[in-house]
Swiss-Prot record:
It is found in: Cytoplasm. Homodimer or homotetramer. It catalyses: S-adenosyl 3-(methylsulfanyl)propylamine + putrescine = S-methyl-5'-thioadenosine + spermidine + H(+). It comes from the Bacteria. One of its GO terms (molecular function) is spermidine synthase activity. PROSITE patterns: PABS_1, PABS_2. It is an enzyme of class 2 (transferase). This is Polyamine aminopropyltransferase. The keyword Nucleotide-binding does not apply. One of its GO terms (biological process) is spermidine biosynthetic process. Belongs to the spermidine/spermine synthase family. Its main location: cytoplasm.
């Protein structure tokens, strides 16, 4: 494993160092100016880069794919975490697979009902880097309710049966690192088995525009396992297309019929993106998405 070392480098005003991320087919992409390189290293699994952008703040990337930026990470983390958390009647035990930056854990821990939240991250160096450089998202690491496990999530979840109220999959891109292991039908079945009867599940399932293949495959596989499977969407400005998909699933809870907006209105923790109106609206899908999923 690569040791975590200081790699800060101030760039001179005339130095134009840019970060490029290419989307599907390498014909479209994202580029960001780097005014400070904070960390760059290679673990046994993936390349880790952390740098500063004048407008977006600290940017975190794995294998050349943007994971978080300080300015917009709340959009992704709130939608991934709070949709399932508010749908469960009393979430006490939560498993997060992936999400080594800590943002999803931070949001889960905003719920006072939570007694234990396990964050299972495959790459220990990501946890070290997040703890040191991603203060905004890793602030929940030392919460007494949090437990950090370094393990392959696809293998770890198989240890449990009827154990969790909520399982959240905060995976990397399926083509990077070991992210593909978290997109298999066998993995989704293991998550189903690890949930209690009233348990709920959510997963990031890529963008429904450039990554349409992975998006459709995830929905197809999840819906084979869970009797209730619904896609919902949210904005994510630095992810491909700006439109991001998530998939909610459960053994019996419906994300619209069983949603209680009053629980959200009474919530006394800060939410910058998610609210009761956004919850309902996020499940309204554009026609092109419905068509790809065979829903029209």
């Amino acid at each position: 494993m690569c040791e975590l070392k200081e790699l800060e480098r101030e760039l001179q005003p005339r130095q134009h160092l840019w970060y490029f991320e290419y989307y599907t087919g390498n014909n479209v992409g994202l580029f960001m100016k780097m005014n400070r390189v904070i960390y760059s290293g290679q673990s046994d699994i993936q390349r880790i880069d952390i740098f500063e952008n004048p407008d977006l703040g600290v940017v975190f990337a794995l294998d050349g794919i943007t994971m978080t930026t300080e300015k917009d990470e709340f959009m992704y983390h709130e939608m991934l975490a709070h949709v399932p958390m508010f749908l469960h009647p009393n979430p006490k035990k939560v498993l997060i697979i992936g999400g080594g930056d800590g943002g999803t854990l931070r949001e889960v821990l905003k719920h006072d009902s939570v007694e234990k939240a396990i964050l299972c991250e495959v790459d220990g160096l990501v946890i070290e880097a997040a703890r040191k450089y991603l203060k905004q998202t890793s602030c929940g690491f030392d919460d007494p309710r949090a437990e950090i496990v370094i393990a392959n999530g696809a293998e770890y979840v198989r240890k449990f049966k009827n154990e969790f109220d909520v399982i959240i999959i905060d995976s990397t891109d399926p083509t990077a690192g070991q992210g593909g292991h978290l997109f298999t039908e066998e993995f989704y079945q293991a998550c189903y088995d690890a949930l209690k009867e009233d348990g709920v599940f959510s997963a990031e399932t890529e963008d429904p525009f450039y990554d349409i293949g992975w998006f459709k495959l995830a929905y197809k596989r999840i819906s084979k396992v869970f009797p209730i499977t619904k896609v919902y969407l949210g904005f994510m400005t630095t992810y491909p297309s700006g439109m991001w998909s998530y998939t909610f699933a459960s053994k019996g809870i419906d994300p619209i019929k069983d949603f209680d907006p009053e629980k959200v209105r009474k919530f006394n923790k800060e939410l910058k993106y998610y609210n009761e109106e956004v919850h309902v609206a996020s499940f309204a899908l554009p026609n092109f998405v419905k068509k790809e999923l065979g829903l029209m």
